[in-house]
A protein has these predicted regions:
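Functional-site microenvironments in short loops/helix caps that host divalent-cation chemistry
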Residues: 1-161
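Conserved small/polar residues in nucleotide/adenosyl-binding loops
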Residues: 164-165
């Protein structure tokens, strides 16, 4: 997994990946496709749920351990106890089971950037039909206007920040 990248770097990777793919398509006589991009928060949430309705975690249940007592994702089980789940840092993507869409580590391991702008009021005033708030901050904007949504939690976050929905 990739860690330590800014939102700008993640977005730049999407642009680079689009250019590489379009070059390959052009060389093979294929048509261009949609650009690669960071997901909207609502898109990330649906992808993380794996098509399960209102599922708290990608694996479908409210628990962070399976029946054998093993953790179902790589996140900090409790305060200051990083080692308890066997993942003292990031782990290989295939270390845990995929969700219903076949996506791995949608909770824990590394957090994911979304293209949605972060604003504390968006959850109070947002609408179910279009809950994503997009704002392209300008260089001179206040830092508060430059915040972006991060979802999924990471290996160093407790399980409650790894929920698939808010």
């Amino acid at each position: 997994p990739v860690v330590g990248v800014t939102w700008t770097q993640a977005k730049a990777f999407s642009v680079w990946r689009t250019q590489i793919y379009h070059s390959w398509l052009e060389a093979n006589g294929d048509l261009f496709v949609n650009d690669f991009r960071l997901p909207l928060e609502s898109e990330w949430e649906r992808a993380a749920r794996g098509d399960l309705e209102q599922s708290q975690f990608p694996w479908g249940g409210p628990y962070i351990r399976n029946a054998s007592g093993c953790f179902l994702a790589n996140f900090k089980p409790m305060r200051g106890r990083y080692f308890e789940d066997g993942g003292f840092h990031t782990v290989k993507v295939y270390s845990y089971n995929p969700n219903g869409f076949g996506l791995y580590c949608m909770a824990g391991n590394v957090a994911e950037w979304c293209s949605t702008a972060f604003d504390e009021s968006q959850y109070e005033f947002g609408h179910d039909m279009n809950s994503d708030y997009e704002y392209e901050a300008k260089d001179g904007d206040h830092p508060v206007k430059k915040r972006k949504v991060i979802r999924g939690g990471s290996w160093k976050d407790i399980g409650s920040v790894s929920y698939t929905h808010l």
